[in-house]
Amino acid sequence: MLCISNIMLEKPNKGGIMRYGKIGVATAMAVGAAVGYAVESGKWFITVIAVLAGVALLSLVKRRVDEVVEDERTVRVGERASRRTVEIFSIGAALSGAVMLALDLHTEAALALEFAVCCVLVLYLIFYGYYSFRALD
């Protein structure tokens, strides 16, 4: 920061958290609109392109953020929230699927729920094993 008499001149900020947030909201809206159009028109490849472009744009913008975006507490809260989400989804979806299968209601949906639970648990085990042997940053 450079002070000239009573006027303070600051270096222009390349990108702050607020700017990242605004671009993130705009990107989410654009991706949502593109996905809506793709579903309506039946063109699945538009969805893939829109999501990949949105992820790439957010990645580029986040690299330019100079401020601290998260601290240790934020990371720990995210870890706990993620773990509870997986636990609650797995238990709820497994029970819902089992009840639906037992009552012979919407068999395809029940099997999809059970399959989703299996996939989530397999992914959890893969990541747990990966991070068990890898040094945590």
Swiss-Prot record:
Entry's transmembrane regions: 20-39, 44-61, 86-105, 109-131
Topology class, membrane: Multi-pass membrane protein
Subcellular location: Cell membrane
Keywords: Cell membrane, Membrane, Transmembrane, Transmembrane helix
Pfam families listed in its UniProt record: DUF2178
InterPro entries, sorted: DUF2178_TM
Any GO CC annotation of this UniProt entry: plasma membrane
Protein name stated in the entry: Uncharacterized protein AF_1792
Organism listed in the record: Archaeoglobus fulgidus (strain ATCC 49558 / DSM 4304 / JCM 9628 / NBRC 100126 / VC-16)
